[in-house]
Amino acid sequence: MTGRVALVTGAARGIGAATVAALAADGWRVVAMDLCADDPALPYALGSRAELDRVVAAAPDPAAVAAAEADVRDPDALAAAVRLAEERWGGLDAAVAAAGVIAGGVPAWQVPPGQEQAVLDVDLGGVLNLARVAVPALLRRPEPRRGRFVAVASAAATRGLPMLAAYCAAKAGVAGFVRALAAELGGTGVTANAVSPGSTQTPILDESARLYGLPAAGVFAAQQPLGRLVSPAEVAAVIAFLAGDGASAMTGAVVPVDGGLAL
């Protein structure tokens, strides 16, 4: 994979940070993007610039990873991150939509509108916005193209999780979107896929535990036949596979990385 270029959103921590690490270890050059600020609509801390800088510093070659602060709800900011990849490294070969937030803890009709909108705008709108600016860049690569668009969905896309209605709706939308995008990209050499993580050791799972009044996120492990939580690195390994040549025959897939949660 040496010489290929990726853009990863939500890169300061969790699955996004692990994806940057996995791609960098495989020789990719990566634009690691995150908002690096809290959202006043959400009751928990989001990724910080310090965390993003640590992701960059941990890469085998920190010069091959560029940090970018941008909001996935802002198409112009996303376009600037794509331009950074093209201007610094000559193009874009993969776009990974890993930014996500969560809110809830009460029935759908009681969720504050600002929280609900934040989840929909980041978790679904952010994926659409990334595709809007990244897919044209993937298509600008010369033929035969090997472009990859990969989004992070969730096992919540197919499960009716109480008190997390907006999150379930957004992730179901991600799964549907990548299938439609894959159909639209047919014949171009660019593919679109998603991963569907189960309960994964991330700040979002910590917040989920708080929303459910649980003592720790580890309680969710009991739901998965694997008997433990999934690690961000395990999800990132599948994302890196989908971004690579080994997944060239896969498009429109939503790949479970869920410890058997969907069984």
Locations of the language-model features?
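Short-chain dehydrogenase/reductase
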Residues: T2-W89, A103-V106, G114-Q115, E207
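Active-site helix of classical SDR
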Residues: A131, A170, V178
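Alpha-helical segment proximal to the catalytic Tyr-Lys
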Residues: P136, A183-G187, S248
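Short, small/polar-rich loop/turn modules that mediate ligand/substrate recognition or access, typified
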Residues: R146, G186, T191, M250-G252
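Residue(s) in the substrate-gating loop at a strand-loop-helix junction
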Residues: S154
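Substrate-binding pocket helix/loop in short-chain dehydrogenase/reductase
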Residues: V106-A108, Q115-L120, F220
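C-terminal substrate-recognition "lid" of short-chain dehydrogenase/reductases
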Residues: W89, R228-V257, A262
